[in-house]
């Protein structure tokens, strides 16, 4: 909710005046140097969730953490890795935003949030990314995964390989969309690593995550963003929500205010 997100967003300001505990940055992408150690006083916050972390996107400095290395389901935040691999395929010249994405029977049978794709339908990659980022559509995410990886199982192997490259030590993906599956687990810290990577290397993702409403099928299908902070929190830019019975309410939120770029991850909220 708005108040909870505002509390995380204000952490940085309180710490800027603090002194005490030395916190070594724990979140950084591969091929980036470690940020300088900062002297900060960690805020005394007890959040109504299972795990959380707040980092400075630019430096990777950890500003707040709670149970950040505890493994748990992350629901549709999983789609951040699906998006990362997709944008990387575009950067490599393997795809364009106009590439047609076919819909398989497998994608059609995805449950949860969806845009009700029909087998044989085709959308451009641009349209599918809107469905994934705005409506968190599981069917669209799996269709994109099949396009990029050839099949969802093959794509999941790519997801896990990329996670290992990024140092996401406690993450195992079992699917491309985040539906509850045994062994499909991550941590708040690993989600922050993944989020920082896509925001840093694929900033075009913000074009999609910042969309509040859009349409598909010539206006017949309405897309409304699942991230309600877009309407309530000054400076919010993304990134991805997630909710399942096993994961609870989750979000990895990116925001920019007064020159600060922050990433807040909350997992397992009621």
Where are these regions (language model features)?
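Active-site-adjacent loops and short helices of periplasmic peptidoglycan-processing enzymes
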Residues: 19-189, 199-202
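Domain-scale selection of a single, long terminal region
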Residues: 13-18, 270
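Domain-terminus/edge residues, biased toward the C-terminal soluble/receptor-binding domains
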Residues: 168-172, 176, 180-270
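Conserved catalytic motifs of the protein kinase core domain
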Residues: 7-8, 50, 259
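Single conserved hydrophobic/aromatic residue that forms the stacking wall/gate
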Residues: 1-15
């Amino acid at each position: 909710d708005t108040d909870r997100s505002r509390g995380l967003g204000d952490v940085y300001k309180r710490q800027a005046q603090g002194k005490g505990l030395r916190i070594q940055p724990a979140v950084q992408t591969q091929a980036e140097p470690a940020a300088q150690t900062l002297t900060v006083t960690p805020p005394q916050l007890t959040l109504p969730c299972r795990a959380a972390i707040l980092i400075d996107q630019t430096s990777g400095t950890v500003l707040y953490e709670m149970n950040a290395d505890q493994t748990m389901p992350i629901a549709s935040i999983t789609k951040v890795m699906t998006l990362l691999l997709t944008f990387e395929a575009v950067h490599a010249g393997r795809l364009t935003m106009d590439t047609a994405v076919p819909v398989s029977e497998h994608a059609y049978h995805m449950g949860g949030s969806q845009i009700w794709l029909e087998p044989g339908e085709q959308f451009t990659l641009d349209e599918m990314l809107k469905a994934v980022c705005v409506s968190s559509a599981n069917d669209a995410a799996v269709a994109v995964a099949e396009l990029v990886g050839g099949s969802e199982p093959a794509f999941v192997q790519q997801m896990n390989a990329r996670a290992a490259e990024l140092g996401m030590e406690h993450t195992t993906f079992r699917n491309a969309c985040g539906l509850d599956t045994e062994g499909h687990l991550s941590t708040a810290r690993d989600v922050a690593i993944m989020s920082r990577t896509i925001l840093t290397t694929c900033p075009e993702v913000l074009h999609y995550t910042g969309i509040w409403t859009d349409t598909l099928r010539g206006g017949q299908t309405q897309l409304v963003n699942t991230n309600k902070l877009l309407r309530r929190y000054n400076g919010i830019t993304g990134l991805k929500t997630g909710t399942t019975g096993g994961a609870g309410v989750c979000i990895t939120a990116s925001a920019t205010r007064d020159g600060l770029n922050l990433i807040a991850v909350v997992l397992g909220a009621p």
